[in-house]
Amino acid sequence: MIKKFIDKLLGKGAAGAGKHRFGKREEVPASVHGINPDLVDRRASDVVRTLKQAGYEAYIVGGAVRDLLLGLKPKDFDVATNATPEQVKGLFRRAFIIGKRFRIVHVVHGRGREHEVIEVSTFRAYLDNTAIEQQVSGNEKTSKQQLSGMQHAVDASGRVLRDNVWGPQDEDATRRDFTVNAMYYDPETQVVVDYHKGIQDAKKKLLRMIGDPATRYREDPVRIIRAVRFSAKLAALGFTIEPKTAGPLIASQALLSDVPQSRMFDEMLKLLQTGHALATIAQLKKLGMSKGIYPLLDVVVERAELPFVHAALADTDRRVGEGKPVAPSFLLACVLWQDVKTGWDLRLAQRQHPFPALQDAIDEVFNQRIGDVSGRGKLAADMREIWVMQPR
């Protein structure tokens, strides 16, 4: 039902909506793009060099290239290659294949708190979901057994459930979300490979979706959240979201109801814990999306102007900016303390003993607001510890 409703709203089937557009390869030299090679992490360059010496293609990719073009030093460096995960793993002493939905390799440099992880992904094919034979019912949570042995699978709504079909670089670029995140940089030749005018958009400071935005949101509804997150993150640098990219966001929002709760919870934390929580809330309001993405996020947005909550959000942004760790338990405990306090006061008015009354109020709020998410046990314990300290 949701798929049909969204299709009607977005006009699925319009001419050209399903065409493959792999873009035209442009190799842009250093004299044009102006990237300062001193901003490139040596460990990322070493990973690229090792892969190339083994006969593979390899590039720094994604947001790191965007930041380099803007003259910024990236916090994280990802590498893309035509080597398979198994081939990548065989080239490095400390490399680990992770993920099932998207199989990637973590190449680890250093140890302890000083260690650095370079994420290496294999070029992936761009597959038109209308041509996929491996269509399954259910969603990411209910179709794990059905996905066994599949390299690429989608559900009836067109959402990608598994994406491990390797392909050429041009298709890998097309399957990425935004033009400014779909460029490839070779630190040895200092050439940027650009298929979708990403350099041009970076100079214009424009966040633009690759392909038809409505179709891309249908393929993976979490792209809706990423559009908000990146537009908020890049707003501080003067970026604006392209109207065609922003246009279908509200109409596509209902697609998020099919995404498993644990994944939605994780995506919400990314919105709030990547150093741009206040900017994200402002962007949600600007886009008319302050409600309806995720119930707990609705509460955060609603209470963001309360001094206690605003201070917690601002402190989280500050700590991320300073490279310090942040904990979801602290931020969520601040946001939901109002509910716990109300429930506790109600129980005290009924002459319940203070400590058991507080514990009951905590249980009620956690079950209602957080629900069944991955990592629930530790999160609950940490939030409980914070809340129990408040009456002291």
Give the ranges of each region predicted by the language model.
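Catalytic cores of the polymerase beta-like nucleotidyltransferase superfamily
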Residues: 1-392
